[in-house]
Amino acid sequence: MSQSVFEASRRRTFAIISHPDAGKTTLTEKFLLYAGAVGEAGAVKAREGRRSATSDWMEMEKKRGISISSTALTFDYRGMQFNLLDTPGHRDFSEDTYRVLAAVDSVVMVLDVAKGIEPQTLKLFEVCRSRNLPVITFLNKYDRPGRAPLELLDEIEEQIGLRPTPATWPVGIPGDFRGVIDRTSGEFTRFTRTVRGSAIAPEEVISTDQAAVEEGSAWAQAVDDVELLDAVGAVVDSESFLAAESTPVFVGSALTNFGVRHVLDTLVDLAPAAGERLDVHESPRALDSGCSAFVFKVQANMDKSHRDRIAFVRVCSGKFERGMVLTCHRTGKPFATKYASQVFGAERSTVDEAFPGDVVGLVNATDLQIGDSLYVGEPVEFPAIPRFAPEVFASARPLDTGRFKQFRRGLDQLDSEGVVQVLRDPQQGDANPVLAAVGQLQFEVFASRLEIEFNAPSEVTPSPYESIRFTDEESAERLKEIGGIRIMRRGDGRLVALFESRYRLQRLESDEPELVLEPINVGT
């Protein structure tokens, strides 16, 4: 077995998805605590006098206590190397999450027991389904009042189409949490609170006879539920899990650390290792072939003192070594990897080598774009990174015209990250750009980063546009003659038409079908 194949077998590259406030960032912190990567779990919210979450680094994340940009966290657990791609928790940042899901091999889905499947969770799960990603489910906040677990299992099956197979089952109702039954061993682990969840939770395993006496009717009800689950065949099955047909379900409380170890152990025992990646021709790239990777995220100014630009890549094959020269498939140009890092929140460590499944931050990646394929030896091109079509639009202008140079530099850098698209008028250039995004909060972040990172305070105001379409030069000339339509150009050079009225767009598509008006679909 080659070194690349062996190391790939040790990798577990995954992401956590959830609706905002379901507990994703909390669970991320607790994974790091249990793996020994941090000595004390960071606070999820940035409250005055307490530190913000370890994985949150951007100024706005610290102030608001939400995850806005995804970060790659690496830690070891039970002899495996975990690569956890932290994802934005706010609904307006689903596009960044979408890209992260293109770089992982499995997913942990966090559900609030009081709310069940929520809109953002459902939207992100559809992305998981499109990539056939295995999903582990964690029913969180069971120490608080919530819905019956059997009801939640029905909802999982009905709304997302995965067969839920509980690996642990709760004793007690939500808000009166006594512990869980391990359905494999039959053991009962009693729930014990820890102070603010800052330390690993003690795990008291007691006999079933003792549990029957001490937990009374709560134990009897849990045993009845487990017998029902056994009768309907709702048991964890590795084959159906890896085929994305079933989802192992765990019950716990991330805030108090209960159930965290169960999920980590399942990632080791059941989750897929890094495997061969398919190229655009659907041919697998052998793990032991020349080094290859693809860019799934670009982030500017993670180091304020250097105003740098990092391209995050997922290694797909071979052994990455710092200093090696990779070729970019899109441009055919070489890229020297002199500066390669692992990023842990705002902290960095130099990466000298990496293997399939690993995430590496390539510093000073000014010529790399999201979706770029990199390789050594035999050329390879991996599939494009999917993206959502913009749904909201805004205009931007610098408050101080003397800072226009900084404003323009900020536009270029933040546009290159691909979350907010900067649209420019072909005649006016940077003078009156339109921002296009998936959600409104992205504009607030955009303005904040322009001011903090580029010293270019700006005004961002809503634009009246409702729809966007790709067009061409010939159609653009006709569209310019019609009111309520504006022709702009994306950073990649493609012309787009912005429509103030969806009705007008529909009429044009019907009355003048010869016009080029292509929807901006996933991957374009």
Per-region residue spans from a language model:
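Structural and coupling elements of P-loop NTPases
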Residues: 1-524
